[in-house]
Regions:
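Alpha-helical membrane-inserting segments
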Residues: 23-31, 47-48, 72-80, 97-102, ...
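Generic detector of multi-pass transmembrane helix bundles and their immediately adjacent loops
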Residues: 430-571, 577-580
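Core alpha-helical transmembrane segments of integral membrane proteins
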Residues: 31-32, 346-444, 466
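Structural signature of hydrophobic alpha-helical transmembrane segments
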Residues: 27-42, 76-93, 134-140, 380, ...
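Long, hydrophobic alpha-helical segments that serve as membrane-spanning/inserting helices
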Residues: 1-15, 22, 26, 30, ...
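Helix-loop-helix transmembrane hairpins and adjacent membrane-interface loops
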Residues: 2-14, 19-132, 146, 150
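Hydrophobic alpha-helical transmembrane segments
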Residues: 11, 15-19, 60-68, 88-93, ...
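Membrane-interface helix caps and helix-loop-helix hairpins in membrane proteins
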Residues: 55-56, 77-84, 103-104, 125-135, ...
Length: 695
């Protein structure tokens, strides 16, 4: 019972965040300096935004950089304010200087909003204490935050990676169960595939997250992570065999009508899903796995495959489920390989600065957007006669996310949560609760808010708002005067952030669809080349298979976000959704062919070359349609035509997959040709060629 409590992801996270915030307050209360303890607890907010609690092989180096930036921004803000430099100019300069961090790496990019939050906190402190005191608070606060988190991760060793792996196993279980519960609905892929696409997307997202964590921890070089690395490779093998399909609905229907295959296949899928959920709990709660066997289920599937040798569905399901059962029984990967190399971009400072100076730099555009929003917020504060509009500025930074959809949701949660929290705080302030009870309530609210923040940001905002009001009450005894202005400030900040995302150099995902589609086709082409090569090696095959899945996942994410964006043609996005559906079929065929190539199921050199040429021509036709902007730009008549495919008796499984890939590619070319007439006619779409949009 205690394992389920202490290792639960939400509980473990909430305990860590609550303790790192509340222990300084408790120490301040004991020594009679409660106000210093409350001020000290502001620093973890900056550290959380900067991601300084991310387990990393350079953990303390990142802490030093973060503390230096926080203290530096605080010092610059105080000195420039003392020289009567306008606040909009100060924030614009800080934003444009620190914006280069986004060119170094995505993790470094989080230092920009965190450093700006530190500068904004300084606004509320300037004039009330010496210049050096905020610097000392940031330096010591970051040191305390780092030491505490280092001790916590040492105490709960491997827990962040275990949480991600546990989520991955659970997602694979849900995906496997959902996939085979729709067995008889495969006749209508448009209805059966979308929910599976969402689950497949979540699984690939979690795989990418595990890759990032392992590379940040250098897990492949650390013996302490050997068991978790093996569990991750097992999950990769399971995902490979779960996310495959023959896409022969007629054959599926025949087999279901002639036998009890549907019940047997579903029995196998449910057994696999149940075992994956048990393994997810074992990983999360630090338990050794128990023995497992599914001989009866596999035996029943083998019997059906032998009774219907003319039907490929039985053999296909038996082959893949037997591999899944082997992984679950032996608790070892199907084959040995190293961890795929880290592809995340990391640049040294000088090359990053060079890229940042280009007007095409996304990092520069993002910094420009934030600087304009900060300036507008500062000017709005001046118009409202607020000398220090720190709450408007903080709201803008807290609700601004990477995309339009995420920002819109965060704005809704933030505004409603703040409203409810201020109402609750306003009512309870009239009760004149003693200080000791107030601190106890703040502790409970902080813990409860962190328990739910990952799943419901709005309700967590309610708790944080009440805590903020009580903090002001304890520091200045004017919490009631804080309520109405802060509500107005929150609404103003949300409006500024929304306007900035819509009108200031927006990066619409709809405009990135064809680039991501082009990248997905390139990944497919490289995978097919490897599969049809003379001597395909297991490790390069595994790496390229994952790149194919990740490229398609990026495309699918872009489509999902584009469907939520304003002002785009719904018919065009609907056609692109169908295009992405066929792209997912190709991914599943590549997953299946990778397993066959690794088992040395190969074609003759001449036949492999002919199939490779056909696939490459079909892919290039799709790329031509994506690349040229004007109708007819790639020629109204297809320049590249697929050669006649060999017709010789019964096709092998590998040939069946290749034939279907070519069919899907031809369909995708037709879809993109029809969808092109309804494409957007503004923004990034004004580029005449796709390569012009790649910067």
């Amino acid at each position: 019972m205690w394992r389920r409590l202490i290792y639960h992801p939400e509980i473990n996270y909430a305990l860590r965040q609550t303790l790192v915030l509340c222990l300084p307050v408790a120490v301040g209360l004991l020594i009679g300096q409660l106000h210093l303890g409350l001020l000290f607890s502001l620093v973890p907010a900056c550290c959380n935004i900067a991601g300084l609690d991310t387990p990393h092989k350079r953990f303390f180096k990142r802490l030093i950089i973060g503390a230096s930036l926080f203290a530096g921004c605080s010092l610059v803000t105080q000195l420039l304010l003392a020289e009567s430099i306008p606040l909009p100019l100060i924030l614009t300069g800080l934003t444009l200087v620190l914006g280069v961090t986004a060119e170094i790496s995505p993790l470094h990019a989080r230092l920009l909003p965190a450093s700006l939050i530190a500068a904004i906190f300084t606004l509320s402190l300037a004039g009330y204490m010496p210049v050096w005191e905020p610097l000392l608070i940031y330096a010591l606060g970051t040191l305390w935050y780092g030491v505490f988190n280092w001790f916590w991760f040492w105490l709960w060793r491997e827990q962040p990676l275990r949480e991600s792996l546990s989520l991955l196993y659970r997602e694979l279980a849900d995906y496997c169960e959902a996939k085979y519960s729709l067995l008889t609905q495969h006749i209508d892929p448009e209805k059966a595939l979308p929910p599976l696409l969402i689950r497949q997307q979540k699984a690939v997202d979690l795989i990418t997250q595990c890759y990032q964590q392992m590379h940040m921890l250098s897990a492949h070089n650390n013996n302490d992570y050997k068991r978790l690395l093996r569990a991750f490779q097992e999950a990769m093998d399971l995902q490979e065999h779960i996310s495959v399909s023959l896409h022969q609905p007629e054959e599926v229907q025949k087999l279901v009508e002639r036998s009890h295959a549907e019940e047997v296949i579903r029995w196998n899928a449910q057994t696999v899903a149940a075992r994956l959920r048990v393994l997810a709990d074992d990983i999360l709660y630090h338990r050794l796995p128990t023995r497992f066997s599914m001989e009866k289920q596999i035996g029943a599937l083998e019997k059906i495959a032998n009774q219907h040798p003319e039907n490929p569905v039985g053999q296909f399901c038996y082959w893949h489920f037997s591999r899944i059962a082997r992984v679950l029984r032996t608790q070892r990967p199907l084959y040995a390989r190293d961890l795929m190399a880290d592809k995340q971009r990391r640049l040294p400072l000088l090359p990053a600065l060079k890229n940042y100076m280009s007007l095409k730099s996304p990092a520069l555009r993002n910094a420009g957007r934030i600087s304009v929003m900060m300036s507008i917020a500062s000017l709005m504060g001046s118009a409202l006669h607020l000398p220090k509009p720190y709450w408007i500025l903080m709201t803008v930074l807290f609700v601004t996310q990477n995309g339009y959809g995420a920002t819109r949701v965060r704005i809704l949660h933030r505004s409603v949560g703040t409203l409810v929290g201020l109402v609750i705080a306003g009512v309870t302030l009239h009760l004149h609760i003693p200080e000791s009870i107030t601190l106890a309530v703040m502790l409970v609210l902080t813990l409860a808010s962190y328990l739910i923040i990952r799943k419901n940001y709005g309700w967590a905002t309610v708790g944080f708002t009440v805590t903020a009001v009580y903090t002001i009450q304890l520091l200045t005894l004017n919490g009631e005067q804080f309520i109405v202005p802060r509500l107005i400030d929150t609404l103003i900040g949300c409006l500024i952030a929304f306007g900035g995302m819509v009108w200031l150099w927006p990066q619409w995902q709809s405009g990135l669809l064809r680039k991501n589609a082009h990248d997905a086709l390139e990944a497919d082409q490289e995978a097919i080349r490897l599969i049809l090569s003379n001597d395909p090696q297991a490790t390069p095959l595994a790496y390229q298979r994952m790149r194919v899945n990740q490229a398609h996942n990026t495309l699918f994410n872009s489509l999902n976000q584009a469907m939520q964006e304003p002002g785009f043609n719904i018919h065009y996005l609907s056609d692109m959704k169908l295009w992405v559906t066929h792209s997912q079929f190709i991914v599943e065929h590549i997953n299946a062919m990778t397993t066959l190539a690794r088992e040395h199921t190969m074609l003759t050199p001449d036949l492999a070359q002919r199939y490779l040429e056909s696939c490459e021509i079909a892919i290039q036709r799709c790329q031509q349609r994506l690349e040229y902007d004007r109708p007819g730009g790639s020629g109204d008549v297809n320049i590249l035509e697929s050669p006649d495919m060999p017709s010789h008796g019964l096709l092998s499984t590998l040939e069946q997959h290749l034939q279907r890939i070519i069919g899907h590619l031809n369909t995708m070319h037709t879809i993109s040709s029809m969808a092109w007439r309804q494409r957007p006619h503004h923004g990034i779409w004004l580029s005449k060629r796709l390569r012009d949009t790649k910067s």
